Amino acid sequence: MITPLQPREFFRGVWRGEGELRPHPLLRIFLPVQPFRFSCNVTWLSDSIWTVDDRFDFASGRVLKRRMFAELVAPDRIHVTADDMPGGADILLHERGFRFTPYYALGAHREGGRVYRLRCFDECTLDDRGFLHDTIRIYYRGLPVATMRIGPVDLGRDGAA
């Protein structure tokens, strides 16, 4: 199985999956659980730099698109930046997945609504079948507000579907 420690082979093609954004129980009165479909398209620009185009299609009809720029800065570390990710983050690679260093993301409650600076803790793990599972714990001013789970994500490899 190809692992994240082989970034040129691992981070490629189109990834697809489903997930949900699950607000903290105390917030569910105002914010319902939001299922979504996820796709990610990776385009390599050089031997060490690539773009990641993420798309989230929520059941409510809302569509969220973002582009990240990624650079391999060490054999086991990638640095990523995006317009909604002030300061970016590092991705630490290991054989069974990868995790982001804690990062800030800018998120709006509703389309065109107020933008909040959210602290995110993001971990991705590979299961034995080669599918990726991503869990993002989201905080606002130190308080937990939501957890986003994506997976299983089909990495588009032969035999993984």
Language model region names:
Residues 18-113:
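Central antiparallel beta-sheet cores of small beta-barrel/beta-sandwich binding domains
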Residues 1, 76-161:
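Beta-sheet ligand-binding and adhesion/scaffold domains
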Residues 1-51, 57-59, 131, 135-137, ...:
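Amphipathic/hydrophobic helical signal segments and adjacent flexible N-terminal regions
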